[in-house]
């Protein structure tokens, strides 16, 4: 998401970041899109808590930080006194619940008014608040907040486009009631499968450029753990961290850089109460085998525990399982992490 923000954001001049990349060859596209649009970029990864009040205050904080990125609006005559007060209240956490829920709508209107352009909205890990709420027993309260928060996507003429990432597909969850024109690209889709990770030829090129020899097989064993559409994909973070370590120490061992970067409470809750059938299948996967299992890509958090079979869909959608003809744990890091659960 930071890459998209760097490419689109009108406040930045990032031509140098992209000039030697493939996209720089698309001159007309770059003229139209590179650093030409106001951007609202927000991550909801930190919006969590053991109770609703704590999680809500985290959301208030994240929204305030987003508004602080655009403090220059407070100096502009484009906003009137009432609008500036509203901006200030949200920025410093003084706004009421209704204004917090409408904050994305409000900021998009202010930015569009200032730049005389529509706005690009980037929301990373939009479903984390709902996942934490499910685990900690305040699902209904958080659903009300997030439903209002995401109303910025409904009939908002100030939004040019939005990119939203999540573990579970944007589907039937009532958060998005009345919001149309979603295009969902899941891990089974081929449309963008090679753009959000490293594919084999890119990893080969990275190793070649870094003058690292004889590490291709071990790199594949540890970090080639995903299958998006019809393409095998490496985790970029793991690849780059390991390459960095190899440049410092040619004998460096691969490490679990990805470990502990996500919360697995929901998966643990399934495994804690797993029946004999699930336990047997997990043992098969732990031993490097595969299982044949139906996967539902349209899960929502309020129905996750309606069937223990949803465990397989959840593990697949969150990266613990991948598809190689059949479903299997196909990455050393993921296998180690799953065993600890």
Residue ranges of model-derived segments:
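Phosphate-binding site recognition
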Residues: 1-341
């Amino acid at each position: 998401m930071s890459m998209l923000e760097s490419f689109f954001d009108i406040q930045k001049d990032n031509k140098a970041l992209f000039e030697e990349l493939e996209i720089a060859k698309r001159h007309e596209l770059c003229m139209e899109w590179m650093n030409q649009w106001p951007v609202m970029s927000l991550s909801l990864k930190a919006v969590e808590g053991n109770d609703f009040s704590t999680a809500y205050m985290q959301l208030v904080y994240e929204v305030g930080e987003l508004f602080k990125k655009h403090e220059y609006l407070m100096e502009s005559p484009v906003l009137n006194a009432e609008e500036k007060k509203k901006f200030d209240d949200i920025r410093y956490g003084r706004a009421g619940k209704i204004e917090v829920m409408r904050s994305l709508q409000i900021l998009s209107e202010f930015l569009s008014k200032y730049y005389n352009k529509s706005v690009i909205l980037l929301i990373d890990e939009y479903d984390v608040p709902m996942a934490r709420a499910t685990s900690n027993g305040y699902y209904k309260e958080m659903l009300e907040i997030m439903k209002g928060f995401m109303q910025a996507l409904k009939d908002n003429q100030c939004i040019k486009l939005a990119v939203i990432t999540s573990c579970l597909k944007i589907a039937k969850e009532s958060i998005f009631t009345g919001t149309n024109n979603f295009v969902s690209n899941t891990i089974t889709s081929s449309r963008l499968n090679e753009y959000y990770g490293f594919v084999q030829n890119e990893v080969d090129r990275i190793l070649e450029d870094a003058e690292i020899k004889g590490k291709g097989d071990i790199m594949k064993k540890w970090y080639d753990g995903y299958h998006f559409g019809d393409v095998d994909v490496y985790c970029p973070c793991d690849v780059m961290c390991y390459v960095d370590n190899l440049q410092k120490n040619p004998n460096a061992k691969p490490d679990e850089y990805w470990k502990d970067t996500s919360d697995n409470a929901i998966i643990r809750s399934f495994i804690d109460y797993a029946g004999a059938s699930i336990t047997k299948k997990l043992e098969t996967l732990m031993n490097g085998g595969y299982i044949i299992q139906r996967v539902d890509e349209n899960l929502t958090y309020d129905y996750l525990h309606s069937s223990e079979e949803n465990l397989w869909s959840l593990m697949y959608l969150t990266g613990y399982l991948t598809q190689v003809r059949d479903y299997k744990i196909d990455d050393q890091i993921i296998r180690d992490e799953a065993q600890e659960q």
